[in-house]
């Protein structure tokens, strides 16, 4: 029996544009994905080749929402990976949830990415196959394999990694408690005012703040129409000392604020938590 304890970090969309809708119904996006040191923890156990093969076992702990143990991103990822395993074996995964679910932070996608990264390395599965598996599990999963700052395009399959990250890494995450949004629901209400693809130049990485001020989250207003408290969260983040930029991540409901120092970020989190005890609030650092 081999056992692995791995982290699955929260995903944050610094900007997110919807650029096209295909006839298949898929939306093509463009966005800057980053990851934070707020993580779910996974314990992955793999039986030796003489172990009886069985369906994977997946258990979730500490989740705000009830997650099916049979129909989830981790189960899908493991089942697809097992097709490429060198031997038939038994896999069990225990996921301790610290990242809010259905909240725009890629909690399920990051779990799947961590499983693909870990078992892919163990079983020496080629990276192109891992990328295919990741994309079949979800649009955010390919970027979640490496969990590095990355410009994402298409339906999640086009990845351009950021070599020089020119932003402060101090952030605060906040969301109204017991508020959740379904990604398909939010996208289904997108009206079709598509954004033009950004012009990524050689010097764009040198001033990512300028890029962020020229971009936005195209899903933010739709999410606010469904959960109006999102606007209050953004305003609360913007009003704190040292705030540089605040907006919603993904399809919501979590919002992020970038701060000029770790001290100001921690103070902002305390202030918001005191004024809004019903919100979930967390200060964190981006992984760069």
Curated annotation (Swiss-Prot):
PANTHER family: 4-DIPHOSPHOCYTIDYL-2-C-METHYL-D-ERYTHRITOL KINASE, CHLOROPLASTIC
Keyword ATP-binding: yes
Species this chain originates from: Wolbachia sp. subsp. Brugia malayi (strain TRS)
Family statement: Belongs to the GHMP kinase family. IspE subfamily.
Active site residues per record: 11, 140
TM segment ranges: none
Binding site for ATP: 100-110
A molecular function (GO) term: ATP binding
Record's keyword terms, sorted: ATP-binding, Isoprene biosynthesis, Kinase, Nucleotide-binding, Transferase
Reaction(s) this enzyme catalyzes, per UniProt: 4-CDP-2-C-methyl-D-erythritol + ATP = 4-CDP-2-C-methyl-D-erythritol 2-phosphate + ADP + H(+)
Pathway participation: Isoprenoid biosynthesis; isopentenyl diphosphate biosynthesis via DXP pathway; isopentenyl diphosphate from 1-deoxy-D-xylulose 5-phosphate: step 3/6
Protein's name in the database: 4-diphosphocytidyl-2-C-methyl-D-erythritol kinase
Any Pfam family matching the protein: GHMP_kinases_C
EC number: 2.7.1.148
InterPro entries to which the protein is assigned, alphabetical: GHMP_kinase_C_dom, GHMP_kinase_C_sf, GHMP_kinase_N_dom, IspE, Ribosomal_Su5_D2-typ_SF, Ribsml_uS5_D2-typ_fold_subgr
The organism's place on the tree of life at top rank: Bacteria
Protein function: Catalyzes the phosphorylation of the position 2 hydroxy group of 4-diphosphocytidyl-2C-methyl-D-erythritol.
Gene Ontology biological process terms, A to Z: isopentenyl diphosphate biosynthetic process, methylerythritol 4-phosphate pathway; terpenoid biosynthetic process
């Amino acid at each position: 029996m081999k056992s692995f304890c791995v982290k699955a970090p929260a995903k944050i969309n610094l900007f997110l544009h919807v650029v096209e809708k295909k006839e298949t119904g898929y939306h093509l996006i463009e966005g800057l994905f980053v990851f934070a040191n707020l993580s779910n923890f996974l314990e992955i156990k793999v039986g030796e080749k003489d172990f009886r093969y069985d369906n994977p076992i997946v258990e979730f702990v500490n989740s705000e929402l009830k997650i099916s143990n049979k129909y989830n991103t981790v189960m899908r990822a493991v089942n697809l990976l097992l097709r490429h395993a060198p031997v038939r074996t038994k896999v069990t995964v225990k996921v301790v949830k610290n990242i809010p679910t259905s909240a725009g932070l890629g909690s399920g996608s990051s779990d799947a990415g961590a499983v693909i990264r870990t078992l892919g390395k163990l079983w020496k599965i080629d990276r192109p196959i891992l990328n295919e598996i990741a994309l079949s599990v979800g649009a955010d999963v390919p970027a979640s394999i490496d969990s590095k700052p990355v410009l994402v395009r298409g339906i999640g399959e086009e990845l351009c990694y950021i070599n020089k990250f020119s932003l402060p890494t101090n952030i605060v995450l906040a969301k109204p408690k017991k508020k959740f949004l379904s990604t398909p629901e939010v996208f289904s209400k997108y009206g079709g005012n598509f954004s033009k693809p950004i012009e990524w130049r050689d010097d764009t990485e040198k001033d990512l703040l300028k890029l962020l001020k020229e971009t936005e989250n195209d899903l933010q207003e739709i999410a606010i129409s469904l959960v109006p408290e999102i606007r209050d969260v953004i305003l609360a983040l913007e009003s704190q000392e040292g705030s540089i930029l605040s907006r919603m991540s993904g399809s919501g409901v979590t919002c992020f604020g970038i701060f000029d120092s770790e001290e100001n970020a921690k103070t902002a989190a305390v202030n918001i938590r005191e004024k809004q005890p019903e919100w979930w609030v967390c200060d964190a650092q981006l992984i760069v």
